[in-house]
Amino acid sequence: MTEKDKAPNPEDVIEMDDSFSPQFVQEVNRVKSQIKSLIENNTTLRFFKPLTSNLGDVTAILRISFNNMMSKMEEKEKQSLVKELIKLVHHVAEKNTQDKVFIAASYERVVDELLRYANQKEVISTTLCVEGLIMTSDFRMCSRIDQEKWKFIKECIPKIDYKGIRTIIRYILESQLRRLPYQLSPEKVNELRRVEDVLLKIVDRDLNLMPPLITLSEVMRGTPKQAHMFPRLTEKLANLSSHFRPIADLTHVCGRPFIYPIPFHPAFHPPTSYWEDFGMNAQSPYTQSHHMLPYRPQHKAASCLYTFYMILRQPLGKDSLNPTNRNKTKSHWEPLLSVMIVEAMAETEALPEGKQIPRYQWDNITNLVMYGMSHLLVNPKNFFHYLKGLINQCKYTRARDEVMWIVFQVVSSLHKMIKIEDAVQEIVDLYNELFDGEFSWHGASDHPARMARFLAAASTWMLLEKNKAHKQNTDTIKSHIKVIHEAALNFDPKNMGMLAVLANAFKSDTRIGAQIVPAMSEALNTPPDPSQPTFDLSYQRKAVNQFDAFPKEFLDALTSRAKRSLLGQILSVFRSFGTDKLPSPAAFETLARICQSEDYEMAVKDLESLASRSLHISTQERAADIATNNQAKDQCHFLFDFLAYRLPHVHSYGKYTSTTGSLLLYFTASVAPNTPQNHQVYRLLEQALLRRMYWRTFHESVINHSQLFGSSYKENSNNVMLRHLKNPKTFSTPVDQWQFPLNPEIFKMTIYAFMRALKITGQEIPLDGTMHPIHVAGYGWPEKSTTFFPKWALEEIKKTDVKKLAPNYAEILSTTDEAFRMNTLLTGGQYVIRYADDPNPITYHCMLAVIFKQLCSKPEQDLTSEYYQVMEKKSPKDIVVMGNYLVDFIIADVKNNQDCNEQTFKTIAKTAALMCFHFNIHRADRFLLSLIMHPSTDEDAQICIQIANEFLLTPKFQERIKWFYENDVPRKEKDPYEYIKAIVKYHDAFPEFEACQLVPKNDDTGTNVHMPTYYGCLIERLLPILDQYVYVALEQQGYKMSNALLQLVSMFYRYHPMPIHFMYSVLFVSHGKMAGPDAKSFVSAFASQIEECHLTEEFEKYNHQKSSCEELIMELLDRMAASLDFVLTPPTFVAKDWRTAEMSPGAQALYLACIELMASPHSPEKLVNAMINVMQMRPHLRPFNVFNLIALLLTALPSTYADALHEEFIGVFKNGETANLKFEEIVFDNYDSSLLLHLPNRARSINMIAQIYWTQCNMALLNPFANDQVPKLLEHVKTEKDLWYTLRLVMPIIRRFWDSWDFAKTMRALRERFGPLVIMKLIIEKLGSMAESGVEIVHEAPFCDLFYNCKYVFVGDFLRETAITEFAKLPEAMRERLKYYVSQNEPAPPETPEREKTPERKDQQKEQQEQQHQQHHQNPQLHHEAQHHPHHPHQQPSMPPPQLIPQHHLQHHQQQLHHQQQQQQHLSQMMPPPQQPLQHLPHHQMDMAPPTPAPMHHQQHQMAMHQQMYPGQMFHHPQGGHMGYGMQHHMQQPHPHHPQMQGQMPSQMQHMVRMHNMTPQQQQQYAYMMQQQQHHYMQQQQHQQHHHM
């Protein structure tokens, strides 16, 4: 051996991990050295090298040696050896010199000979041989392509299973063809014909060598440009792609790029991934696996920006994006905002000359820009760059001041949040673009907003002085800056225009800026008339006599920074005030306008923080500092009075629950001492909490409730509040020191609102580990009021023992009678001691019932003082319990009265009115709340609702709301000053007193116990309670309400903050129960009182009787389109100011349309039919927009409308309409193309509406659709076209399931009960039954492609058993195409968890294997016994651990072990070669092949397919790292003892390990037994094959 052989070249040394033995590495290096010696040190080769390249057969000895060595290797070692040989060939070939070309060809030929000989002797598999032959070819074309070798490869292709073929085509396309030069001579192209033939054979669909979907994925993913140099291959690949066009279109909704939701839509749930993933740049790892299908460009996520655009451009639309800091939308904000600005500029150009620019949409755009930059969704430099480029192209200049105002807002307000320095040059360029050429400047000193925009450019340059941008100032800018400085020197606070400019241009840290904002704040708290410094609020509380708040026009002229400065000054006034001189109404109204014009985080958040802090301080009584206590309580009261009544509905409340949590914590703590101030604060905070939780949009209600109670007190022991909220019955008496914190009836109202929201939105919520079932079980529920409850809540109610929750009516009657009788027997003082100070639980809460009985018996007699003294000593919680006790007494008394009639209820109502309005012993809103919420049965609720009806109709109750109308009290938003003054007059006319004020006292000092009230009154407190009253009254009275009650209750809704939501929800939950005329009367009565409720004339005047249903639907759709598509000014039928509106313009038009349709006399079937006919009536400019609007309507309507659409869909089958449709018309998304030819088809329109309906609906409705409606559809499917028509609907639904982020987790949990699996199982069964009944199937190939796509993308192997059964019924050609669908090595039932091919499964397996690996290292001996314990009955048990063997036997055992290893090595050399590889068997034999004798290469192919099943990386390599000569798939395998390889060791190695502790005789017996077992398996397979054929 030469020196060179002893010391191999470092570049030739094999690099192996620890899994390979040193002997193996040594043998590999020896083979490489022998090959090198055979070629490079061959004397004959050197002599004949100039003459020929034919060496002759000089590899015979090497072949035999190589074969013997390979036969002793495991499969992994064989693969590693082949990889090293390939590296050897490529290493020589890459030395591109003239001498090395011949040598490289020789290396290739020798290695090929070795591989083919080893394959011939069955030492290596055909797959491994072909892979090696492919990779040794020199595709750099430095040497010739071996034609005979590639002919051999072509012949071997049919012998390889499809997983091996997939690897082969990957190697050819990705690893080899990429090496081709881009210019080839005709001769070299001709050499590559054999390679092209191999590829053509592999991708030929007719040969069916592997699933066509896999072929397509490999071709589209890995085809290099060099492949298109072969015309036949190029044509074949193009045809292959065209075959999958139907499947690609079928899995997408028709017109998907033009589908968009509406913010505040009941079915639009922002946190779901569906809408965010499409059009919002979501790069989910699960969206990659079938990108290889030839989708339309419109279906790419980046092309669906229209969805995001339509959400953003709607005012308040950004509030629906949740969570706000998600990066999914980040890259799209800048171009979309730029487009919106230029679009508004274009519309401004079209305005008449001299007309003022409407700022409705400009304010929205400014708010969007500020929101995007503050949340780091918009980069200033990129944004201004985009905007400058668009303006440069469009040349719009009229709205240049609005654009500069946006720039100024960014520069002025966000300098601490963003790096404005990077965008200075872009701002300068944008200014030059806007003010290029001659132009005229327009400003108005008497118009603050116009003045601020006129000087916005100059103010911007003043703030950018630090960045030296002022050096590029124009003369105009310099003159404007001079004007600003002169105005600062001659500061005039009365000049509102310049005041706004100065507040914007000078920061608070400058000398001028430090004077301006405090001067503005001082103006709000300085009375205009010094002689009248204060103004009397309700109950003679004094406030600063200033009502002139800053107008909206002035606030719109301030930047966000200036507004925040002013907000801080106002809040500082609220922190320091005198109880005899409260903050002015002007300060409150200015604060309200700032809060409504800014986002929650910029304004309301600071106010709520101050209110929460004030609440905390006010509950800490300081005995030594009474003045501080009173001031803290005053501050707490007027702040929550402002939040509850002036800002009852801020759209971002639903995202933040901190204030709600603070209120709950307040109620959790005991309120002490028992003072009238504490009573008033308690009642106010009850209202604040009720409004915060009850008046929410539907999705906000679900989110709010889930955030607060989405965990149980058992799961979250640290949350004390949840423990308190366990049982409502503990409100009066604590149990185990836990007491329900707030009024149980208020909390019950919020549960009703939560249940209605679940019904309307169709959402499903998690229940395990939450408080929701506990809360439902804690109450009694009248059955008529639970018709809309979800199934889980009804089941919880059934399990609840109603008798335990029912009050003891007999005890209540006797206790009340005794207390009433004792009033005549005891003196006043004795009576007070017994019923106020004695904590007897039976009599402690009966006083209101006693007073009620007293007034019933003697209505004309005044109440004596002892009653007031008893009430004075009750705590706020006691008053709540006493109110419920009163209702229980009334119910018991009515039930006990045998002569109960209508007059009885009138008497009760009249007495209650005396209590509430004349004697002030009880609050009317509290009494009404107890009446409608406290009853727990239908019988009790029926009694209480009749009393409530009569109570509302009493003169004393009616005169209060009529006083509002007679005095024309305006809404707070419309004229807040007149409203505050009216509230003062109202309380003068109808005062409400505390109990302490009604007790005559000798030492009365005249102290005013009333808290400061600016906005609250009885009318306001009644609004949320009347909402619930209407629901209960309709439910308990058969959804009828008297006209007198309807007219009375509707009067309150002039002041309701969410009247449209209320009307919509009432009609939704009562749909199908309230008769048409009653619904019309209900809507008309309420709509007449609501200022922003603009219904169509057709409904208001003619009740939808004048025109056809199609014309009605078209009018509603036109209104919706107008509210969504406006650019500058919204249509007249929506709110005029989006900042104070109940909802966005599009949502308002949608809700009003739904209200009309639900109250319409026409049936849902007739209206749905009209919606379909609309598409046939006239050509539509934007047909997909019409479809989308129809779907938005249907998803916002009750389920009966969807049922009508479902029946229309079934009618297509019944009428045989699919027979008139071509296959292409059904599956392809070409509806708009057919409309261009004026060929609308009703069947296609129905399918389109259904597709978009199920796209827009809530995800929770999809599983019921799969389980209930799909079977009904398939019952009517008779022909192949019917089935394709059904697939056109259900495949986009399966796709939507798949787009859900928790798709894999849900599939694993539900298995075959999961929607996509249910649908696909029904489809497969239907196709099988159709084939069995003789239905002709024309489009067989698309069906097969569809099933493969569904398997590898949507359903995996869960339906394998169904497929085996049903595919056997199909025609032979389809069975042949689908033979790979169920091809697996080991069949397993669906229950086997190992068959789940989900991403989460990989992580779980990895964690389990890592744990096993750790256990193996901790106790290797136990691990060895667990892994390799022999399972043969003749095998002896293994030896005990060494520590258990006696010392004198240990040496003997080691000698015996060494002898066994020698015998084992000798026996392994004598063992026969492995059996024929499984890929040579038919595929149905592969399915039944036993796992033990399977070759390792087949197991690894199968392992790769199983690990990449769905839904993610089915068709993809790992992206990181270089693919080492194309052999990474096999060669870079992990360590066999690594957790990933445990359980996958080669069978032969397992046999070796099992024989480790055997005697030589046992080893021979075991080897013979295994050989016989393999023979038996082969016979069994042949028998099964014969049976199958």
Swiss-Prot record:
Q: Which domain of life is it from?
A: Eukaryota
Q: Which UniProt keywords apply?
A: Activator, Nucleus, Transcription, Transcription regulation
Chain positions covered by the region annotation Disordered: 1381-1499
Q: Does the keyword Transcription apply?
A: yes
Record-linked Pfam families: Med23
- GO CC terms in record: mediator complex; transcription regulator complex
Claim: Transcription regulation is one of the keywords in the record: yes
Biased composition (Basic and acidic residues) is annotated at 1392-1410
InterPro entries this protein is in?
A: Mediator_Med23
**Which biological process annotations from GO are given for this protein?**
positive regulation of gene expression; regulation of transcription by RNA polymerase II
Compositionally biased spans, kind Low complexity: 1457-1470
Q: State the compartments where it is located.
A: Nucleus
Q: Which residues cross the membrane?
A: none
The entry's function note states: Component of the Mediator complex, a coactivator involved in the regulated transcription of nearly all RNA polymerase II-dependent genes. Mediator functions as a bridge to convey information from gene-specific regulatory proteins to the basal RNA polymerase II transcription machinery. Mediator is recruited to promoters by direct interactions with regulatory proteins and serves as a scaffold for the assembly of a functional preinitiation complex with RNA polymerase II and the general transcription factors.
- Family assignment? Belongs to the Mediator complex subunit 23 family.
Q: How does it assemble?
A: Component of the Mediator complex.
Q: What is this protein called?
A: Mediator of RNA polymerase II transcription subunit 23
Q: State the species of origin.
A: Caenorhabditis briggsae
